[in-house]
């Protein structure tokens, strides 16, 4: 009796004090309060290192374009000096016209060259920016999809989507496009200042008096805007989470007529984002206005002093004109830099959120590389396993579970909802690691086994299987990464009693099932999921029987498919049907995280214990009146524990 099961009993003490558990999980609980080690702008720039060659060419083109922008005022000033000459004699007039024509020709050459270089610079920087955002999104998605399941238990999907799309876009602009503009304006400013000093060092020093004041203001403004931008992006991510949640549960929303509630809930978060955005707009507006006023005042003072120098003969009219044009060009570049600084501060807030995720280290140990196969292939053992979900560390779900499944055996788990049945299946799949104890496959602890090998050997069919928004064929072959032939897929579908309904569709195996398989019925989804598991040909099967209402024919087809799936495999089934329990080699009753009874169906009934009470309560309950013993449910749908 119960040969496939070992039980340890006795008093169980809490494995970890509540404070210790909480500290171990602080990165999950604190969320955005955990700061990445390095979010400096240099790290953002490093994202474009793969395009360094193209960016060097773009930078050279940028320098030429910036120089051309400054040379135009220089030759414009020459034209002023030429037309200011005394040209009363015909030969002087002819010479002046020749000089003007030659100067204009120089200006045309400069403008054409600058335009070509500007186009080249824009093309190279923009193409690099697209590659940067693609690379960043791939890296971020790859990092996220390899995080432990506990991370997704406490992190909203909408927030992750916001970081993948919106935040990466902001960083892209900062890393390339805005960098291009910043370099252009810095170069233009530097060259312009050089020409200004060459024209009149006195006027230049006067123009630069205001620079220290502006620098201090920009620094303080940048710090404030960076934090405000971070808060705005965080609020937008929460709004995205609500929208994603509402769309994903739209049938539940509709069935409870809660559309207006969801609209209100989303609107409240959007209003929070709007409030922060308006505050940000106000601050940016005040800063831009103040900067513009300071720059304009500086130009006015320079013009007044320059006019005085010209009147007194220290400058020519052309030189003053060139200087004014230089100062306007430099002022325009500085103003553009202030706008780019605003964007960079926003990118700093976004990069903090993205790099926080990229720097996050999974709390689960890395998988090993062992691929254990022996004469006991398919043996699973849980040895004194204690476990609490990271999102609820103070609530111990499993308390010293010891359970052994011999190859080819069938063990059924029954018991009250919340007892820990589904948690046992989750741990065997290594969705989580136990806090204490070991789980072994073929005698090897799960952390030492190759991730790919483990999930080729172990498959799970849950109560509500999840299908992807692709064809039925792609869903069935999902675990084999497209390496399954059409014949293999069709054979698996036949074994799962899915072939006939698939062939009834116009596109047959090419039929797209919709998001989460929404275009298929419950029974059809379950049979496709069974076919997917059959194609993987696992040695260990974790089966959570569906308790959702199916019509008699669908229930028969699903049950028949499950029987085919279980043949010749080690099976751990979370049982809800009496027929499944009767056919099990061992039945384990799970209550409050412990195995309280075990044995065969008949042995447990003869003991007149908890199992007997469960069966009697279910068979005598009003919801099962008229239900035969063969199909009666042992336990209502569990709550995922």
UniProtKB/Swiss-Prot annotation:
Which Gene Ontology cellular component terms are annotated? membrane; plant-type vacuole membrane
What causes induction of this gene? Induced by aluminum in roots.
Residues forming the ABC transmembrane type-1 domain are: 55-346
| UniProt key word Mitochondrion | no
What superkingdom does the record give? Eukaryota
Q: Where is it made, tissue-wise? A: Expressed in primary roots ans lateral roots.
Similarity-based family: Belongs to the ABC transporter superfamily. ABCB family. Multidrug resistance exporter (TC 3.A.1.201) subfamily.
**Entry protein name:** ABC transporter B family member 25
Which organism was this protein described from? Answer: Oryza sativa subsp. japonica (Rice)
């Amino acid at each position: 009796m119960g040969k496939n099961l070992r039980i340890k009993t006795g008093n169980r003490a809490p494995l970890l004090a509540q404070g210790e558990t909480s500290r171990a999980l602080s990165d999950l609980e604190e969320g955005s309060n955990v700061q990445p080690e390095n979010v400096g702008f240099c790290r953002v720039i490093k994202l474009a290192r793969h395009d360094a060659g193209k960016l060097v060419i773009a930078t050279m083109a940028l320098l030429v374009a910036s120089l051309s922008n400054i040379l135009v005022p220089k030759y414009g000033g020459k034209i002023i000096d030429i037309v200011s000459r005394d040209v009363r004699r015909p030969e002087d007039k002819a010479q002046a016209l020749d000089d003007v024509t030659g100067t204009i020709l120089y200006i045309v050459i400069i403008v054409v060259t600058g335009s070509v270089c500007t186009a080249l610079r824009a093309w190279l920087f923009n193409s690099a920016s697209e590659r940067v955002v693609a690379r960043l999104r791939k890296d971020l998605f790859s990092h996220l999809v390899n995080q432990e399941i506990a991370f997704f238990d406490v992190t909203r999907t909408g927030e992750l989507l916001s970081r993948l799309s919106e935040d990466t876009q902001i960083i892209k602009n900062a890393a390339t496009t805005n960098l291009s503009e910043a370099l252009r304006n810095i170069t233009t400013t530097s060259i312009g200042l050089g020409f200004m000093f060459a024209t009149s060092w006195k006027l230049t020093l006067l123009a630069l008096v205001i620079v220290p004041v502006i620098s201090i203001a920009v620094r303080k403004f940048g710090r404030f805007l960076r934090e405000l931008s971070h808060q705005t992006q965080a609020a937008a991510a929460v709004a995205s989470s609500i929208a994603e949640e509402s769309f994903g549960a739209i049938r539940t929303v509709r069935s409870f007529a809660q559309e207006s509630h969801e609209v209100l809930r989303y609107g409240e978060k959007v209003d929070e984002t709007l409030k922060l955005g308006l505050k940000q707009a106000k601050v940016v507006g005040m800063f831009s206005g103040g900067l513009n006023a300071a720059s304009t005042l500086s130009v006015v003072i320079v013009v007044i002093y320059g006019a005085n120098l010209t009147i007194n003969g220290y400058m020519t009219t052309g030189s003053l004109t060139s200087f004014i044009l230089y100062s306007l060009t430099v002022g325009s570049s500085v103003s553009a830099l202030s706008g780019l600084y605003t964007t960079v501060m926003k990118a700093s807030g976004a990069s903090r959120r993205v790099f926080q995720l990229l720097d996050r280290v999974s709390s689960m140990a890395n998988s090993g590389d062992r691929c254990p196969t022996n004469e006991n292939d398919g043996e699973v053992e849980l040895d004194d396993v204690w476990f609490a979900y990271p999102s609820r560390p103070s609530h111990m779900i499993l308390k010293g579970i010891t359970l052994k499944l011999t190859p080819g055996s069938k063990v059924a788990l029954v018991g009250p909802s919340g007892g820990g049945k589904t948690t046992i299946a989750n741990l065997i799949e290594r969705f989580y690691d136990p806090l204490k104890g070991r789980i072994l496959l073929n005698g090897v602890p799960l952390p030492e086994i190759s991730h790919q090998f483990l999930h080729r050997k172990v498959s799970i069919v849950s109560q509500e299987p999840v299908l992807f928004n692709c064809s039925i064929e792609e869903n069935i072959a999902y675990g084999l990464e497209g390496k399954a032939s059409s014949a293999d897929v069709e054979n698996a579908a036949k074994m799962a009693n899915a072939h006939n309904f698939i062939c009834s569709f116009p596109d047959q195996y090419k039929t797209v099932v919709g998001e989460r398989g929404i275009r298929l019925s419950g029974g059809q989804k379950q049979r496709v999921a069974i076919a997917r598991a059959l194609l993987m040909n696992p040695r260990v099967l974790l089966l959570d029987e569906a308790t959702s209402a199916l019509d008699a024919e669908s229930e028969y087809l699903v049950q028949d498919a499950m029987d085919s799936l279980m043949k010749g495999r080690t099976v751990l089934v979370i049982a809800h049907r009496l027929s499944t329990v009767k056919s099990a080699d061992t039945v384990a009753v799970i209550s409050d995280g412990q195995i309280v009874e075990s044995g065969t169906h008949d042995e447990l009934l003869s003991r007149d214990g908890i199992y007997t009470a469960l069966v009697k309560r279910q068979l005598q309950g009003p919801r099962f009146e008229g239900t035969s013993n063969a199909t009666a449910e042992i336990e209502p749908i569990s709550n995922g524990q």
